[in-house]
Amino acid sequence: MPSKKVLQTEHINTTDEAPKTTSVRPRKRKADVAIHLQDPDEEVTEMTRKKQCASQACWNPDTGYTSPCRRIPTPDEVEEPVAFGSVGFTQYASESIFITPTRSTPLPALCWASKDEVWNNLLGKDKLYLRDTRVMERHPNLQPKMRAILLDWLMEVCEVYKLHRETFYLGQDYFDRFMATQENVLKTTLQLIGISCLFIAAKMEEIYPPKVHQFAYVTDGACTEDDILSMEIIIMKELNWSLSPLTPVAWLNIYMQMAYLKETAEVLTAQYPQATFVQIAELLDLCILDVRSLEFSYSLLAASALFHFSSLELVIKVSGLKWCDLEECVRWMVPFAMSIREAGSSALKTFKGIAADDMHNIQTHVPYLEWLGKVHSYQLVDIESSQRSPVPTGVLTPPPSSEKPESTIS
């Protein structure tokens, strides 16, 4: 997958495009705690339920009604409501049921929804969007390193086209779940699947998604526009049109928001320092390249990444997780955090045409494959010998969240 086309894309202008302007496009983004509103997953479920109900209402010739004049119910009819008591169903009547979250909610009281209902909806995403931890066994012609190279290249494409971090992680989720539905995928098809997943993700997340020919261009002729459009349909059908997971970076956004939130009224506006968010997001970027990341839920990955930059007490407060939930993932993530530390903190990048308060949300690309190569050279740190509130030795630890730093953490 050559990257020269990716680098050249920044300098390409087509003659039929409108003249560039220096104005900043408003791309104000809200925190993901409002994701339960107009949830696409609920819409897909509702459409499926209606389709099933409609098919059940059709005339069944095997029911014993042989008269051709039998009246067939139509979807437009509205039947009068029937009381339970009048038909003998009083024993099935029950009071309203209130759902209790499986993890304590860190959300503040919300004026527009129940905080428990919102939190339970967020937790439900982790259980709904499952990934196959043994996905590579289904593809004997592929190696885990090929997945890492592909995802690293997709990050590079995202940076060139100024796509959001959420777009990359949606594409990564689509790719992993699609691969779990297939068998014996050839390595020559891998790039087409990856760029098609990113194409779908961009249309789901971006206000101004790139056109299909722009995605085809960065493949350096390996994938045509028709190839991408055809693969798009195949992927969405295999995923059963379930395209709205709560990604690791979305969970990180929620955790960071809860850690730095001062005013409840500002819950939908980012309150945390951008530089801190970028540092932790880079750790997530590096971890997601490793196929073992499939063993952990997205909420757990984000919480473990935050742990390496803060404290156990803070992570418990903002995630509702306990140390017994975090321990395995935190231990696995230690070499990745040490690799990030050795590489040093990356400066917050600026992008022309992107609002200042949205810069941290743009996916960036750094030498992740080089950093990944160093991960395996580190030995796991013995957390128990560290400190009582276990933070692995040698891992970046910023000031306590109570200080609310506004500058870059060194």
Curated annotation (Swiss-Prot):
Keywords in alphabetical order, please: Cell cycle, Cell division, Cyclin, Nucleus, Phosphoprotein
The record's Pfam families line, in alphabetical order, gives: Cyclin_C, Cyclin_N
- Is this entry keyworded Phosphoprotein? yes
User: Quick one: where's region Disordered?
Assistant: 1-31, 387-410
Does the entry feature the keyword ATP-binding, yes or no?
no
Q: Which residues get modified to Phosphothreonine?
A: T397
What is the protein's major site of localization?
nucleus
Q: Name one GO molecular function term.
A: cyclin-dependent protein serine/threonine kinase regulator activity
Q: How is it modified after translation?
A: Phosphorylation by CDK2 triggers its release from CDK2 and degradation via the ubiquitin proteasome pathway.
A single Gene Ontology biological process assigned to it is: positive regulation of G1/S transition of mitotic cell cycle
Tell me where in or outside the cell this protein is found. Answer: Nucleus
Which is a Gene Ontology cellular component entry for this protein?
microtubule organizing center
- List the InterPro entries hit by this protein, alphabetically: Cyclin, Cyclin-like_dom, Cyclin-like_sf, Cyclin_C-dom, Cyclin_N, Cyclins_cyclin-box
* Family, similarity comment: Belongs to the cyclin family. Cyclin E subfamily.
Q: Supply the PANTHER family for this chain.
A: CYCLINS (PTHR10177)
| Assembly | Interacts with CDK2 protein kinase to form a serine/threonine kinase holoenzyme complex. The cyclin subunit imparts substrate specificity to the complex.
Outline what the protein does: Essential for the control of the cell cycle at the G1/S (start) transition.
- This protein is called G1/S-specific cyclin-E1
